[in-house]
């Protein structure tokens, strides 16, 4: 079964393997659409994720997805396939495939009832005192539309400071149109979006963090992105942002018990902040990449 979701800036394909009306495997792919922001540097990358139910593994279902992936890569002119796994069978499959492990990371979770609130308040005070001319801005909704022209390029710059490890990748380009589309999707899902950022006297956004809360899982807050400009690091801005956001979310969502966030294992500064706050590893994973030609060799060997 094949499902197609034609998003505004990406082409999404979803495939399902069904046994007696029961979905036993799924495959999802994404590729940047021609004309989308960042297309020139992202056009050659196809991203995918798939899974097979445990009782149906080792029957060739995972291998059956490979010709589909090759067909999609050829159709869109992609030369690199990016995959991921959070389970040992998945890592073993990707090793068999010949994909190279390029980045490792984890979902880390903070149990809010165990937070050291005295430390959190101290970090907030230290942030204010350490950067007295830096303004903290709080948005308990999306960034206002009137600010997107100014916000989008600075947000893009922050996003592109994320550690990529050995992953081949394009440039992240967040335009006002891209952000509006993302906000529309959040609204359709019923998400509540919150952003805290720091702005320097010259108007430059030196750091930011944002979080979503979902009514269908009210106990868990999802921290999406936290970043500080390289030229603003060493001033405690990351701790200030994380502490302020945590304190605010605890007040707005007193019944929430967890904050979940994802971090690359190589992101030492952010992991150090998270560890002091009480974040603990919940689920480990890795990203892999394989070239189109190497995938084709594996597909030919299956015939």
In which residue ranges do the predicted regions lie?
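A conserved beta-strand-loop-helix scaffold within acyl/acetyltransferase catalytic domains
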Residues: 1-15, 19-20, 25-39, 159-220, ...
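Long, hydrophobic/aromatic-enriched structural stretches that serve as scaffold segments
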Residues: 28-80
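Conserved catalytic-core motifs of GNAT/GCN5-like acyltransferases
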Residues: 34, 84-85, 100-114, 275-293
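Conserved acetyl-CoA-binding loop-helix of GNAT-fold acetyltransferases
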Residues: 52, 58-74, 92, 96, ...
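Conserved GNAT acetyl-CoA-binding A-motif
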Residues: 73-86, 249-262
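Conserved N-terminal entry element of GNAT/NAT acetyltransferase domains
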Residues: 115-149, 164-166, 296-303
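Hydrophobic alpha-helical core bundles mediating ligand binding, dimerization, or RNAP-core interactions
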Residues: 148, 152-155, 182-183, 242
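Conserved N-terminal glycine/acidic-rich loop preference
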Residues: 207-209, 222, 235, 240-242, ...
């Amino acid at each position: 079964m094949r499902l197609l979701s034609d998003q505004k800036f990406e082409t999404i394909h979803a495939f399902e393997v069904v046994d007696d009306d029961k979905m036993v495997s799924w495959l999802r792919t994404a590729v940047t659409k021609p004309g989308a922001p960042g297309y020139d540097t992202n056009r050659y990358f196809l991203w995918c994720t798939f899974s097979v139910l445990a009782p149906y593994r080792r029957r060739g279902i995972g291998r059956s997805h490979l010709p589909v992936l090759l067909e999609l890569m050829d159709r869109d002119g992609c030369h690199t396939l990016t995959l991921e796994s959070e389970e040992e069978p998945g890592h073993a499959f990707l090793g068999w495939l010949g994909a190279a492990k390029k980045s490792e990371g984890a979902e880390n979770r903070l149990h809010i009832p165990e937070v050291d609130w005295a430390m959190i308040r101290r970090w907030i005070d230290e942030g204010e005192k350490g950067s007295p001319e830096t303004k903290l801005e709080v948005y308990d909704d999306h960034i206002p539309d009137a600010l997107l022209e100014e916000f989008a390029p600075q947000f893009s710059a922050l996003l592109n400071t994320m550690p990529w490890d050995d992953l081949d990748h394009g440039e992240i380009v967040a335009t006002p149109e891209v952000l509006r589309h993302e906000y529309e999707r959040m609204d359709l899902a019923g998400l509540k979006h919150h952003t805290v950022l720091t702005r320097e006297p010259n108007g430059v956004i030196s750091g930011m963090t944002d979080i979503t809360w979902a009514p269908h899982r009210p106990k868990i807050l999802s921290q999406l992105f936290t970043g500080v400009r390289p030229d603003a690091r060493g001033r405690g801005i990351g701790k200030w942002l994380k502490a302020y956001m945590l304190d605010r979310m605890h007040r707005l969502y007193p019944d929430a018990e967890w904050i979940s966030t994802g971090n690359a294992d190589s992101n030492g500064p952010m992991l150090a902040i998270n560890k002091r706050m009480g974040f603990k590893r919940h689920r480990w994973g890795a990203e892999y990449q394989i070239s189109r030609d190497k995938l084709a060799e594996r597909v030919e060997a299956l015939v």
